[in-house]
Amino acid sequence: MKVLVINSGSSSIKYQLIEMDGEKVLCKGIAERIGIEGSRLVHRVNDEKYVIERELPDHEEALKLILNTLVDEKLGVIKDLKEIDAVGHRVVHGGERFKESVLVDEEVLKAIEEVSPLAPLHNPANLMGIKAAMKLLPGVPNVVVFDTAFHQTIPQKAYLYAIPYEYYEKHRIRRYGFHGTSHRYVSKRAAEILGKKLEELKIITCHIGNGASVAAVKYGKCVDTSMGFTPLEGLVMGTRSGDLDPAIPFFIMEKEGISPQEMYDILNKKSGVYGLSKGFSSDMRDIEEAALKGDEWCKLILDIYHYRIAKYIGAYAAAMNGVDAIVFTAGVGENSPITREDVCSYLEFLGVKLDKQKNEETIRGKEGIISTLDSRVKVLVVPTNEELMIARDTKEIVEKIGR
């Protein structure tokens, strides 16, 4: 079975075509700057990269170019679009309704649209990708995999906010959590690496990229996560503030004379590492490099960043009454030995002992255990693979309906 995985953003479509027998990626790429000047398709087959400059006014045109490229004589990896058995889509927000991945029908499309106010930047773009695929590949089943679904097992005590309950009843304001597909994949893979059943383990997964979140996974089910009603809560991120006193935005708005929308943009796009570094960079690699060269301010930023992660790990060890494994994933988590070492230095009370050499060596797509043999809690690096998780869900659902 061949599954086309699509991640449709506001001005881009990322894609992978995966042969599910052996789970081999046949090709992958991104159509970028959709609806903007300078749009193009970057297509990769094995290690070869091809760039097609083309005007892409909308998502449908972008997907059309992707599909044409898949069957192209020179760049293609299949002879006919009929070889695509199913399409799997990433959808950021499924609200409370979707607790697992589902087959797309009119009712599902309507439900995704209904929860769009909860993810105004993402869900409408995700929908454009789904509708384009349904139009251009008629008769091919489409499956949606929600970022929020994995966190729907979180209990009320962890998802309700201490604000008037009517706001939950009226507007469904609660903790939803994000990066769910990543947390699900790496917790599952960590159990495989440890040679244990997921249902027997208490795992804390740390998805540390430009966006970042921590999840407490108890016996295979998520019981808490650091992102909340929106992806703004929790850790210090590339451009997002993470946790802060809710009175601060009101104070700034009053003092600076700025609107709610401007404040929202500041917290989402100009805060976090970018804000702390006074606009120097939102990329942790730049901060690390400057800190290693002796920049005291960047050293402090690293301290703030790592401290927040360690605090959440400590909290989730308490929430689960113990922890067996801590997993690092995503851009920073997979490639920054400094981050992993510094975070783990706070966790010695849990019995965490890091193997310095293994920690240094486990970067650039490598996976494995980076704690010592006698470490009471195992520490792992697992490169995330959300696309594969989406493809697996898609295959499972399509096989169930017997297509």
UniProtKB/Swiss-Prot annotation:
Taxonomic source organism: Thermotoga petrophila (strain ATCC BAA-488 / DSM 13995 / JCM 10881 / RKU-1)
Q: Which domain of life is it from?
A: Bacteria
User: Catalytic activity annotated for this protein?
Assistant: acetate + ATP = acetyl phosphate + ADP
Concerning SUPFAM superfamilies, the annotation shows:
Actin-like ATPase domain
Looking up HAMAP family in the UniProt record yields: Acetate_kinase (MF_00020)
Assembly, in brief, is:
Homodimer.
EC code: 2.7.2.1
Citing just one GO molecular function, the answer is: acetate kinase activity
Query: Which pathway does it take part in?
Result: Metabolic intermediate biosynthesis; acetyl-CoA biosynthesis; acetyl-CoA from acetate: step 1/2
What positions does the entry give for ATP binding? 14, 207-211, 283-285, 331-335
Q: What is this protein called?
A: Acetate kinase
Pfam families named in the record: Acetate_kinase
Positions bearing the site annotation: Transition state stabilizer: 179, 240
> What Gene Ontology terms for biological process does this UniProt record contain?
acetate metabolic process; acetyl-CoA biosynthetic process
- Described purpose of this protein according to its UniProt entry: Catalyzes the formation of acetyl phosphate from acetate and ATP. Can also catalyze the reverse reaction.
Q: Which cofactor does it need?
A: Mg(2+); Mn(2+)
Q: What class of enzyme is it?
A: transferase
Q: What is its main location?
A: cytoplasm
Q: Which residues bind substrate?
A: 90
Q: Which UniProt keywords apply?
A: ATP-binding, Cytoplasm, Kinase, Magnesium, Metal-binding, Nucleotide-binding, Transferase
Family note: Belongs to the acetokinase family.
| Catalytic site positions | 147
Q: Which GO terms describe its cellular component?
A: cytoplasm
What does the cofactor section's free text say about binding?
A: Mg(2+). Can also accept Mn(2+).
**Location relative to the cell:** Cytoplasm
Gene from which the chain derives: ackA
Tell me the residue numbers annotated for binding Mg(2+).
Answer: 7, 386
